[in-house]
Amino acid sequence: EALDEDDNSLAYSVQLNPQYLLVLADSNIYGKEETTEAPHTHGEIGKVQLKWIEKQFRYAQEHQLRPVLFMHHNLYAHNPAVNKGYVVDDAVELRRLCARYNVKLAFSGHIHAQNIMGPQDMTPTTEIVTSSFCSNDQGYGVVRVHSRHITYVRRNFDMTRYLTDEEKENYTLVHYHKYLKDLQLGSISADMMQSELNQYHEDIELVRAMGNLFGWMNYHFFNGHNHIKASELNKIHASKEYQVLIKHHPEYRLYLKTLYDTSDHSNLQVKIRY
């Protein structure tokens, strides 16, 4: 049952237990009439809902509750090269509220990539973005709530144990993760490979290597398994397929540099202490 609801949006709050208050914000922008045009995909909280969110945070503060924020769009830029339309438009104002009321944890989505960012500047919030369940490797998060901390661990859903005997005869269903991986890798690299084949059709092996590299770099970023050693990253950057790729597609140069992480940071698990 909702503790409170915003009359001007779909936002609401729920007191989970004696320690935590869940604040579920509505960052979507809705059309006012039917249209054949593409919908707005960027997000905004708006002044009215920001006041409502502050009301929830203040309630949590007054009742010794720890607020946890949920919304579709992102609080932080999880990729320095690609973030326009993903970070909520009024993130500055929302981050200011998170800092004022010591909001330590937020969950969001939209980018379809598994990514965790810790506190930024004066904002104490750790933001967890869980990858899209219907693509990549069917990732989902397991959140355990304790009196003095919250843990998050990314898992993979294995549906084979739930298949009927008839469904187990279906190769795609039994090997569904392979199906999703092949689909994702193919769709990511298809356009780039096609443009390369039009120009360099005499070196199909190089084009195939470029497509394979481009696909895997993206795949690793989107499922959060993008932490590698600096020596491995240097090897990738020195490879012929990488060098030709950024030469022919300079628009990818900065983006590709953001996909791997050589630090000890994890995008798969985190512990928030209170």
Model-derived features with residue positions:
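Active-site metal-binding loops of divalent metal-dependent hydrolases
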Residues: 27-28, 73-74, 109-111, 131-132, ...
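A post-motif C-terminal structural segment
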Residues: 125-196
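Active-site-proximal loop/helix segment associated with metal-binding centers of metalloenzymes
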Residues: 28-51, 59-61, 65-70, 75-77, ...
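Acidic-and-aromatic substrate-binding clefts and catalytic sites of carbohydrate-active enzymes
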Residues: 4, 85, 133-136
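Non-catalytic terminal accessory segments
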Residues: 164-274
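Extended active-site neighborhood of metal-dependent phosphoesterases/phosphodiesterases
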Residues: 1-58, 121-128, 139-142, 150-153
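Short catalytic/ligand-binding loop motif for oxyanion handling, primarily in non-cytosolic enzymes
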Residues: 31-33, 76-79, 115-117, 135-138, ...
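His/acidic metal-ligating clusters that form di-metal
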Residues: 21-23, 36-126, 186, 229
